[in-house]
Design a protein with these regions (language model features):
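Alpha-helical transmembrane segments
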Residues: 7-14, 140-149
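Transmembrane alpha-helical segments that form the membrane-embedded catalytic/substrate-channel core
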Residues: 17-27, 84-93, 116-123, 147-158
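Juxtamembrane helix-entry segments on the extracytoplasmic side of multipass membrane proteins
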Residues: 71-73, 134-144
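Membrane-interface helix termini and inter-helical loops of multi-pass transporters
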Residues: 126-135
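Conserved small/polar residues in nucleotide/adenosyl-binding loops
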Residues: 159-164
Length: 169
């Protein structure tokens, strides 16, 4: 068993355990937040803390492997970083969050999740996969790319709309 497969197995077991645990305990986040989960930080800074590892770690993977990677892997990593730059920095700055906080335990557990998630994806993209240039013309690529840009378009609409109701009038 390779290291990557071992990490995948362990992470799958962690995911299954958390899935089962959350049937019995509601995660203290957002509208379900409760006191008693420890020290709290600003929701805006908590969001940046928990999402930014995805951007930075993929950037490190890209820098370390740029010269010996396929064009497809580089393109996929860049799309990933565009998404996580928006998710890590743009959204928290633009979000209508005032005087809200989150438990540090939630931010740190999401930080850990994002760190392991990017380790798995970056290892796949830059060390295991063997994507040929022909992947750029495949149906799954066009479907995924279309979905990516449709989601980006919807986010842009939501960012520029004063109210979500304005989109449906």
């Amino acid at each position: 068993m390779t290291t990557h497969q071992l990490v995948m197995l362990i992470w799958s077991l962690v995911g299954l355990s958390v899935f089962i645990y959350l049937f019995f305990q509601t995660a203290p986040y957002g509208r379900h937040q409760e006191k008693g989960w420890g020290f709290e930080i600003s929701s805006r800074w908590g969001w940046i803390l928990m999402e930014s590892p995805a951007f930075y770690l993929m950037l490190i993977f890209l820098i370390l492997n740029f010269s010996n990677s396929s064009h497809f892997s580089i393109f996929a990593a860049i799309l990933f970083m565009i998404h996580y730059f928006n998710r890590s920095f743009i959204w928290p700055i633009r979000a209508r969050i005032k005087n809200k906080s989150m438990p540090v335990t939630i931010a740190l557990s999401a930080f850990l999740f994002n760190f392991v998630n990017v380790y798995i994806q970056g290892t796949w993209l830059f060390y295991i996969s063997d994507y040929a240039t022909s992947h750029f013309s495949s149906v799954p690529f066009f479907l995924g790319l279309s979905l990516f840009f449709i989601g980006m378009f919807i986010n842009c609409l939501l960012y520029t709309s004063p109210s979500p109701r304005d989109l449906w009038i």
